[in-house]
Amino acid sequence: MLSKFVLLCLLLFVLCSSIHAQDAANPPDAQSNNVVVDPWQGLPMGLDPTRVIDLALEEGWRVNHVLPTARADDAVFVRRVYLDLVGRIPETSEANAFLECNNSGKREALVNSLLDTDEHAEHFAEVFDAILIGRTDAEQLGRRTKAHWIDYLKRFLRENRPWNEVAQEIVLARSGSTVDQGANWYLYSRNNKPQDIAEAVSKDFFGVRIDCAQCHDHPLASEIEQRHYWGLVAFFNRSKNVDTSEGPGVSESAIGGFSEFSNLEGKSLPNELVYLGNRRVEESRPTKDDKEEDRDELYVSNNDSKLKVPKFSRRGAFVENVLTDHPLLARATVNRLWGWMMGRGLVHPVDTLDSYHPPSHPGLLDWLARDLANSNYDIRRLIRSLALTRAYQLSSAEDKFVDPQWFTAALPKPLTAEMLQRSIIVALDPADPSQWNTLEHRASFAKSFPDVLAEESISNVAQGLLLTNGQSINDLASMKHSQFLRSLRDKHDTDSAIISKLFQTILGRIPDADEINQCQGYLSKRIDQRDQAIEGIAWAILTSSEFRFNH
């Protein structure tokens, strides 16, 4: 184990050497004030990722003459980390326990504790589900739950299984056991549409939007070619959904799937098994006069006649020759999790890992991707490293403009549908939380708040209608259903005490003088409707932008 002193010396040596070499070879653009600092290419593995991130970002601040905000206070941090790691605001008792603790290492201890909970696995299963499958209605949400997809994701996160192995299982879609059978849902849910599958696989596992290469080579990123699009489609165009005794499955034919595509010049080209980086899989291609015959000897024998597995499997070849050890798998994972924790990826948007969208810190992204691969694709370790960085623990910039690519301030992040719904339940404390967490309730929130890691956050009419007229929110924010509001009314005599408790419980902070005056004025005019007045203030806080964002 390297001592902190030796580590720092090593980092500074590599840093200074790399900066000097870069400055000599690539002088800054005289018309640009932004200098991309990339001293991390020669940095060895085995170092603490948190420390590497801190030093990389701090050097970027120095070179670009930008200053970070102050460290977020404990009240802001505890709300932020609960939302990011377990998908809800902290309960009052949890927040108070953290705020009253005087241990200097309490932030690290809290991060470790939250990452080891079932809530973390459940929350990130929802995040991965939204990223990999997308939003849907209550019926479809019920189907994917019944197909054990959600359980599969929870188990992977609870056991902290290597992400590359999980990715292979999902793309191969050949899990027959009840425990792993849920992995099949990713392909099954695409309903035998190989182009949809190819576009999803490229975006979800490699961070590359390949759909614009369907008709021609990518006009802005030359490394993405039309043959890569149709080559990726070919890996999946022999797949077919089947329903087995264990649930949804994806069979695969041993023949067919040979076609051609036309480029802009009208020339027809074969759809060879190839993807980005020219990772090609050789396959014997029949001539036009050859007639393929589907025979039993082309398949591996198995107990389920519906679930055919060919001896030469295109999906298997893709997993073995393309997905396994592909550098984009680690890069895409790092970038997406960075975006989740920091509010923006090192490459932005997060699904554009191409030459047209260079990373803000290219060497750092390279180093973190190699570090993730060397750590056996340990997702939890990466999340922990990000949560402990200086950048993650900065305060927000409030009204001051900051260039987000330098991560000099915490970027406000909109709560996902699940985070918002769960946080409302935690704040209002209904007697029966399950009543407010049905498939229908979850689907209504997901429909109105569909985005996860969106390029930009834009409120819409559906969100406004749900928050202002949604029956579930109005019902829950009532004395009838909220144990918190009833307790507030019964235990506190003064308006100031009620107002303070509302803000502390819902927003995790005390109200300022203007907020106290406004709320007191509202209550004083409704003495004969005190219950409704308290409900109104609670509803206003719950539907505020401050509550709907993680700051």
Describe the residue ranges of each PLM region.
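Positively charged n-region of N-terminal signal peptides that target proteins for export
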Residues: 1-5
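Bacterial N-terminal signal peptides
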Residues: 6-17
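N-terminal pre-domain segments of enzymes
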Residues: 22-58
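Primarily short, surface-exposed interaction patches in extracytoplasmic proteins
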Residues: 47-79, 89-116, 133-428, 455, ...
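Post-BTB helical module
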Residues: 83-84
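Metal- or metallocofactor-binding catalytic centers and their adjacent structured scaffolds
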Residues: 118, 122
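Long, His/Glu/Asp-enriched segments that create or flank divalent metal/ion-associated functional microenvironments
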Residues: 425-469, 474-478
